[in-house]
Amino acid sequence: MPKGEPFKIKMVEPIRLIPREDRERALKEAHYNPFFLRSSDVYIDLLTDSGTGAMSQFQWSAMMLGDESYAGASSYYRLKETVTDITGYEYVIPTHQGRGAEKVAFSQLITRPGMYVLSNMFFDTTRGHVQLAGGRPVDLLIDVPTEEYHPFKGNMDTERLEQFIREHGAENIACIVMTVTNNSAGGQPVSMANIRETYQIARKYGVLVLFDVARYAENCHFIRMREEGYADKHPIDIAREMFSYGDGLMMSAKKDALVNIGGLLAFRDEELFTKVGAAVVPFEGFLTYGGLAGRDLEAMAVGLREALDPDYLAYRVGQVQYLGEMLRNAGIPIQWPVGGHAVFIDAAKFLPHVPWDQFPGHALTLALYLEGGVRTVEVGSLMIGRDPETGENVRGPFEFTRLAIPRRVYTNLHLEDVAETVINAFQKREEIRGVKFAREPKVLRHFTAWFDPA
């Protein structure tokens, strides 16, 4: 079996590690928020895997076919054909990115304030758009310790799901969001059995199921590798079965469509398509372009298929595994097993002296940048935000620092540099301090907040 990447590199971008004193200056000027760092001041950028990957020669060549017609562009129909072939959903709407899809979907599905939206676990923008639409997001993730092995740690707790529907009434639930893979839980996969059971419960009570499928191809790979009965199936066939257990999807195409910009909505039912589509035109643009150029639609259509290639998926997940094993072997506490797109360091265990409301996950992001120029992001109580009713900080189930690996960008030597940076920071962990707010936005605060050392 080949050990190398299933591609050759045709173009390169220079990167460098700036001196420590320059990193200290850059972090201070960024108000101790990695989102405000200039990319030129970052050596290895693991802030996100969203839109940061490298496109293939086939995607670049497809962009030359882009039809820039305002309505009815041929590029849209090529994308629609691809989406329908993979998902079985006939009604397809492109959006400028995933949060555009979330915005229009929840604005139409949450029909009155206080309705619940249930999920195996929301990511930041999804949670934010539920709240902005007047809804209440509820996480129903299974409870497994970070250090304990479980093949599908992203699963919905179906017992709690059914209990919640019974107690609060199906009429008070706007929809169920099944997130695959489960980013906030550590990029963890969801089993086909769990997806099927969730859909059966939803149908029993007449509740809509939408997939959040930014990393659906990675989830299909994990099902193929870990779930009985799927080892001999191609990822596209696993995807088709998975989508049969839902009513529609929202997608940030910047992950498993392997593009730098774009999103999707797709539905099985014309009535649902019409309802949600009514909000697309004023927010995103006409239904056949959704805020994107035709060339972006072409690249997305190609990338959706490339992401389901078994060789690509083995490389992709294997690279994340490589970094995770280096850290775990060095005694770094991480979410285990590692997920499909990132390694999640358990910052609460890495920095036990930092209180949860001084955001150990964020404190560690600052330390990793200072130590080795590596940019990462917090996934924990900072990202979750405040209770909209009490105004108090909500303590998250995890305090993670996420090391998200862009697709087809870095080599394993880069990841060895990352591992060395984390290990060096671990040896100095008692010197790392928490943070406090210098300026706190009300919505999605982690993106634009300013901090000071605590």
Swiss-Prot record:
The answer to keyword Lyase applying to this record is yes
Which InterPro entries has this protein been placed in?
ArAA_b-elim_lyase/Thr_aldolase, Beta-eliminating_lyase, PyrdxlP-dep_Trfase, PyrdxlP-dep_Trfase_major, PyrdxlP-dep_Trfase_small, TNase, Tryptophanase_CS
EC number(s) from the headed UniProt entry: 4.1.99.1
The enzyme's main class, written as a single word, is lyase
Alphabetic keyword roster: Lyase, Pyridoxal phosphate, Tryptophan catabolism
Cross-referenced Gene3D superfamilies: Aspartate Aminotransferase, domain 1, Type I PLP-dependent aspartate aminotransferase-like (Major domain)
Catalytic activity reads: L-tryptophan + H2O = indole + pyruvate + NH4(+)
Task: List, in alphabetical order, the Gene Ontology terms for molecular function in this entry.
Answer: tryptophanase activity
Coiled-coil region(s): none
Tell me the disulfide pairings in this chain: none
Part of which pathway?
Amino-acid degradation; L-tryptophan degradation via pyruvate pathway; indole and pyruvate from L-tryptophan: step 1/1
For this UniProt entry, which residues form the secretion signal? none
- Transmembrane spans: none
Annotated family: Belongs to the beta-eliminating lyase family.
What protein does this entry describe?
Tryptophanase 1
The organism of origin for this protein? Symbiobacterium thermophilum (strain DSM 24528 / JCM 14929 / IAM 14863 / T)
| Name of the gene | tnaA1
